[in-house]
Amino acid sequence: MKKILIIILTLLLCTGCFDYKEINDLAIINAIGVDYENDEYVITLEILNDQIDKDSSKITSYTKVGHGKNLTSAIENAADKLSKQLIFNHIKLMILSKSVVENKFDNIIDLFLRNTYFRENFYFISSTDTRPEDLLNHTTNESPIASTAIIDTLESISYSSNTNILKMFDEIIEEVITYGIDTCFSNITLKDDEFIIDGMSIFNNYNYKGNLNSEYVKIYKLLTDNFDRPSYTINYDNLSFTVAINNGKLNTEINNGSINVNGNLMGRILDNDP
């Protein structure tokens, strides 16, 4: 009996995981930027440092860039520059360049639908004026991780001015593959060293149709019944009014080739300039 107990205790206390990895051996990918230049994909991986910065006591990040004729080879090229195993299931953000949304959007959707290494609940945005690589390398002492600063900007604007389209990748997928529904998502740029949400990129199926500015974003959110107290400035007869919409609903229908919008919106005047 004693021998059996000794064997059981030995098995319990001495077992381990055969595929165990030290954290220092892993490269945790926090964000991905995708560009297309000179007939090649350019992948920028934002990687979290495995050690806290001694001076600031903050977690920082760095980037690695890979090139390839397809997305997989570009990612592998970036991975070859690291002596670590890439971990993609912590991704929080993906940024697409103008050339990608214009010509390679369907390839992006296809890759991430097929690849089980990537999770689908990360924010998905475009950057039609600034390269994704430049965005993910824009860090400061206050914001040592660029993707975190971008996400903070996305979320804060969503709850304040209502001028962005905050969507996860799985939402984009659902819209793209659903007949009769076209997708859209926020566009970002870098201006005066600040991340600025610059309207939204819109699509017809997989085809990029262009960008709409922030005022159109507010209208889109009203039409889709997805608004939270947006404000509008109305200029009339040399007067200026700022009106906030509290609640209500708009209905849209197509009749004889014409789009009709009707409904009721309740709001209040926040400010006026006589």
Please identify what each model-predicted range represents.
Residues 2-6, 13-274:
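Membrane-proximal alpha-helical signals and transmembrane carboxylates
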